[in-house]
């Protein structure tokens, strides 16, 4: 299973967050750099993939909630994708 580890500390600014997603998930050139586009791209994953989000408490509450919900929705839509939160680093 492929594992993609996302560090929330590298996703504090919206524009940087989408650049980070594009790099980590090797998203296509046409990726729209918004959460709807991210959802669409992740639903197209066709190999078993585990997405791990670490340091999620570095994100503001709204962003943390939106991303967690998005990854859970992707898991419900695409059986190839699993998601888990990784305990924060001290």
Predicted regions mapped to residue ranges:
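Positively charged, polar, low-complexity stretches
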Residues: 1-90
């Amino acid at each position: 299973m492929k594992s993609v580890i996302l560090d929330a500390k590298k996703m504090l600014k919206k524009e940087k967050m989408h650049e980070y997603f594009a790099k980590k998930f090797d998203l296509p050139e046409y990726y729209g750099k918004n959460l709807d586009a991210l959802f669409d791209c992740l639903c197209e994953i066709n190999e078993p993939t585990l997405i791990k989000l670490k340091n999620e408490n570095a994100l503001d509450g709204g962003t943390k909630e939106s991303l967690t919900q998005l990854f859970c929705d992707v898991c419900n839509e695409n059986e190839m994708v699993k998601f888990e939160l990784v305990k924060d680093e001290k």
